[in-house]
Design a protein with these regions (language model features):
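Short, Lys/Arg-enriched N-terminal segments with co-localized hydrophobic residues
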Residues: 1-7
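C-terminal binding/interaction regions
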Residues: 10-18, 23-25, 29-31, 42, ...
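Glycine-rich phosphate/diphosphate-binding loop of Rossmann-like nucleotide-binding domains
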Residues: 24-82
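Structural motif
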Residues: 33-36, 76, 102-104, 126-130, ...
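Short, ordered loop/turn segments at secondary-structure junctions
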Residues: 40-41, 80-82, 109-110, 133-136, ...
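Short, solvent-exposed amphipathic alpha-helical segments in soluble enzyme
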Residues: 50-56, 93-94, 120-123, 167-168
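Glycine-rich phosphate-binding loop
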Residues: 87-132
Length: 209
C-alpha cells in the first residue's frame, strides 16, 4: 500500500497560529522579544549572523509560543514572502504587538526587497530593522516616504541589525544594556590584541602566526 501523504503547513495554518497567539494575552516575559523574518530560506546564510549576535547577547530561540525557554530574552523566526505570501506578511505585522514582539528584523533580497518596508508600515509603531540581503536590495529597503520610518543596515549586515534590536530593548532592560557593553569591550580587546601582535612581531612575524 502507498504511504500516507505527509501533512503540510499552509499559509492559512500559519495565519491562524499567529492570530491565536495574539489572542492568548500571554505574559510578555514568556513571549519572543525579537522577530526575525526573511523573504526566503535562501536568505538564511546572510541572516544567520543575526542569530549569532543575539546568542552572544544571551538570547535564546523560542520555537514554541506556549513553552518559553529558560532565557529571559528570546527571538523567533519565520519565512515570510511579501510577494508569494502577502497575507502572511500582513498577519505577522498586524499581530506583532499583541504577540509581544518589541522589534522585528526583516531581511529580503533582489531588486524588489519589499518585506522590510512593508512590514514596517503594517507593524507600526513596532520598530523594524531592514536587512538588504544583497547590494541591489539596498534602495528597495531604505526607500520609505516621510512618515513611514524604517531602520536599515548595510547589505548583508544582519549582525548589526541584531545589535540594533538589542539596543532598542536595552532602553527598558538593564541586563541587555550590560551585555551590549560587555560585548563591545570584548570586541575592543580583540582589536587591541591584534594591534599589539602586529607591532611586536612585525609584519613578517604577524603573517606567520
Amino acid at each position: 500500500p502507498s504511504a500516507e501523504p505527509s501533512s503540510m503547513t499552509t499559509v492559512d495554518d500559519l495565519i491562524d497560529r499567529l492570530e491565536a497567539e495574539a489572542a492568548a494575552d500571554a505574559d510578555p516575559a514568556t513571549t519572543p522579544d525579537v522577530g526575525i523574518i526573511m523573504g526566503s530560506d535562501s536568505d538564511l546564510p546572510v541572516m544567520e549572523d543575526a542569530y549569532e549576535a543575539l546568542n552572544e547577547l544571551g538570547f535564546a530561540e523560542q520555537t514554541d509560543f506556549d513553552e518559553a525557554p529558560d532565557a529571559r530574552f528570546t527571538y523567533e523566526s519565520y519565512v515570510v514572502s511579501a510577494h508569494r505570501t502577502p497575507e502572511l506578511m500582513y498577519a505577522y505585522g498586524e499581530t506583532a504587538t499583541e504577540r509581544g514582539l518589541d522589534v522585528i528584523i526583516a531581511g529580503a533580497g533582489g531588486k524588489s526587497a519589499d518585506l522590510p518596508n512593508m512590514t514596517a508600515s503594517i507593524a507600526y509603531p513596532v520598530p523594524v530593522i531592514g536587512v538588504p540581503v544583497q547590494e541591489k536590495s539596498v534602495d528597495s529597503v531604505i526607500g520609505m516616504p516621510t512618515g513611514a520610518p524604517i531602520v536599515a543596515v548595510d547589505a548583508g549586515k544582519s549582525y548589526n541589525a541584531a545589535l540594533s534590536a538589542a539596543q532598542v530593548l536595552a532602553r527598558e532592560h538593564d541586563a541587555i544594556e550590560e551585555r551590549l557593553v560587555d560585548l563591545h569591550e570584548d570586541q575592543k580587546g580583540g582589536v587591541a590584541d591584534v594591534s599589539a601582535d602586529l607591532h611586536d612581531r612585525g609584519i613578517d612575524g604577524f603573517r606567520e602566526r
